[in-house]
Amino acid sequence: MQRRALLGLAILAIGLGIAGCGSATSSAESPKPAGKSPSAISRMVCAEEAVAEIAEVVGAKAAVTAPTWADHLYSCGYRYTEGTMVLSVKELSSWPQTYAYFDELAKTLHKTAPVRGLGQGAFVVGDGSVVVRKDWKILLVDISGLHGMVGSPPSSRDTVALDAAAVILDCWNGD
């Protein structure tokens, strides 16, 4: 029941347009293949605007680690007193690659429930982390390093993951 409520919160957050992070590619543009450096879309997960939007929604400011880029994976950590949440974006170069990577994460991270209305496909995994597919990008909000409730008012780790994913997707959609 709690997971169903959390999934509803994610959908509500998207519907309310909680984030306003910069500009994103329009839905009319074709996906771009992975390049030598991270795309603007990927860099958004660690950008000041997204950090501020996530802090507002979660109710806690995070110290964000320096972003890394390796093997077409862009990531950074959001450090809270309760631990670290890692946001990462895997850039791929085709639909088949994207679907295969998404499906592999579902298997290796132990998908427990789909998330409707988030990206072009999304799911929650065993520890409450969230995976979202949007075009040729896969967002992972990894909360395995968070312990206990986060923010003010306090939110469960699952809620924090869904809220962070919703903020990033709103940034990507240009809302």
Language-model segments: residues:
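Repetitive helical segments and hydrophobic/amphipathic motifs
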Residues: 12-13
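Charged/polar, solvent-exposed surface patches and flexible loops
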Residues: 56, 100, 104-107, 163, ...
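Extracytoplasmic low-complexity, Pro/Thr/Ser/Ala/Gly-rich segments
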Residues: 28-83, 169-172
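Subset-of-secretome marker
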Residues: 42, 48, 53, 85, ...
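Bacterial N-terminal signal peptides that target proteins for export
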Residues: 1-9
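Bacterial lipoprotein signal-peptidase II cleavage site
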Residues: 7, 17-33
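Short, solvent-exposed recognition patches
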Residues: 61-117, 121, 125, 134
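A short, solvent-exposed beta-edge/loop patch
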Residues: 113-175
